[in-house]
Amino acid sequence: ATLIAKFHICFEEGGVKKGDKIALCAKNSAKWGISFLAINTYEAIVVPILADFTPESVNSLVDHSESVILFTNADMWKKLDIKAMPRVHTVISVDDFSLLYTSHENVRTAMKNLQAAFEKKYPLGFTRENVNYPTDNDKELAIINYTSGTTSAPKGVMLRYECLSANVEFGQEHIPSHPGDKIVSMLPMAHMRQMQVAHYAKCSFVRHAD
């Protein structure tokens, strides 16, 4: 939650508004999940892109989705062409959350002085009371998920928050899991099924310690 709050500061400095698109193209990791939730809880629209797509496809989908920020791995970033993604003003590494690129000096300054900005925003400290995410946005667009393009060019599927919550509720009811259970999945987290089963559904079980 602390990292998510810090990313929200960066989004604010970058002029990101509710409903703006932010692309996420990276290998499976805990930081993928943190990046996703940072975007999602800011009420920006997440654009997950499969990390095994060609650099040309990633360039094309980031541009097609009208994304303004890109989260990706450093090795993928080396293969991308920022000129092919003209709306993107900031690129953040999912490897270590460092800044890979920005055309906004205020974003660069915010990233450099992020801890100070965080402490200024939360002068009494960051507590569970500060973790307050939207719950009244079921009908609003949450994700643009591009298909793998097995039989044709990838298509962007537009999903509302209620689509995600309905799948989570179904999974909890019909495929229950418990603390200590192990889940084996070979799908990338940008794949809708992996995102629902191993990411969203598991996050819904998080509880604060008493």
Regions found by a protein language model. Name each.
Residues 109-146, 153, 176-182:
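Conserved pre-ATP/AMP-binding loop-to-beta segment of ANL
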Residues 82-109, 203-204, 208-210:
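Conserved adenylate-forming
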Residues 22, 39, 70, 141, ...:
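Conserved S/T- and glycine-rich ATP-binding loop of Class I adenylate-forming
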Residues 6-53:
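Conserved AMP-binding/adenylate-forming
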Residues 165-210:
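Conserved AMP-binding/adenylation subdomain of ANL enzymes
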Residues 45, 68, 208-209:
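Residue-level detector of anion-binding/catalytic polar loops
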Residues 51-82, 167-184:
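Conserved ATP-dependent adenylate/AMP-binding module captured primarily in the ANL superfamily
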Residues 36-42, 64, 191, 202-204:
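Short hydrophobic alpha-helices that are characteristic scaffold elements of the AMP-binding
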